[in-house]
Amino acid sequence: MGLSGISKSTVSKLCKDIDDRVGAFLDRPLGGEWPYLWLDATYLKQREGGRIVSVAAIIAVAANTEGKREIVGLHIGPSEAETFWATFLKSMARRGLRGVKLVISDAHEGLKAAIRRVVGASWQRCRVHWMRNALAYVPKAQQSMASAALRQAFIQPDRPSASQTLRHVADQLRTKWPKLGAFIDDSEADVLAHLDFPAQHRSKIHSTNPLERLNKEVKRRADVVGIFPNEGSIVRLIGAVLLEANDEWQLQHRYMQTEAMAELTPSPIDPVPTQISTVAA
């Protein structure tokens, strides 16, 4: 931890104090309704059984009906299967996360099924990552042209117009790049899901960009460590960063317009899922 000249007992006490604060933060009750939930992954190196493995640190941020955003969860794991995501979503539901209408994330394997099973919300595939994935099917020399064509769908005022535009663009591009056309066919509904929500909110719910600054700070702190000795050390460091960021957010103005929240259909009280697992700590 860079604490040279300090006794082991003092370091242990400092670590315990941090663990207690982080644990209380990550397991705090969540009141009210949270229509929007962003999930994003940062990949870190951890020692495990004499090997160095890559683990996913999933950060969850949600916006409530008062227009404020909070960091609502952290989950660490070596896998991104449906059970991994379901465990995380259930742990947040146990703490009171309810009323979720839209989950925004990259296309992680197993997540979509877990959202449908645990949360029952719509899913918005991160538009930024979607565009990168789409352009991977296009030669570099022609990516600017393809990008400009695809973006025409995203400036439309509503979902029917956006869908019609994207279908038209896909049909034009598939003659040159059939795999791109197939990719658009498969992902159209997911990348346009945010258009079913209030126009005032769309700039913040079409991608995971609202987490970009937070993830950069997490990565900056993690790079100092390099390889973490165990999962607990990851939770300690990242949890402390998240706690600090969340405190700063609470001093800021509302993140989203509250007037538009009234356009969202109120949710019935969500039943707490059974067989709930807690957040990794």
Question: Each PLM stretch: what is its role?
Answer:
Residues Q152-A281:
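Acidic/histidine-rich catalytic cores and adjacent linkers
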Residues S9-K16, D20, T83-K90, R94, ...:
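Solvent-exposed alpha-helical segments within well-ordered globular domains of core cellular machineries
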Residues S4-I104, E109, A113, R117-A121, ...:
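RNase H-like nuclease fold core
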Residues P139-K140, P198:
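Generic structural signal for alpha-helix starts
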Residues G120-A136:
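Inter-helix linker motif
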Residues G2-L3, G77, R116, G120, ...:
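Amphipathic alpha-helical interaction elements
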Residues K16, G32, E70, T83-K90, ...:
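Conserved phosphate-chemistry cores used by DNA topoisomerases
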Residues E33, A141-D158:
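A polyampholytic, Gly/Pro-enriched intrinsically disordered region
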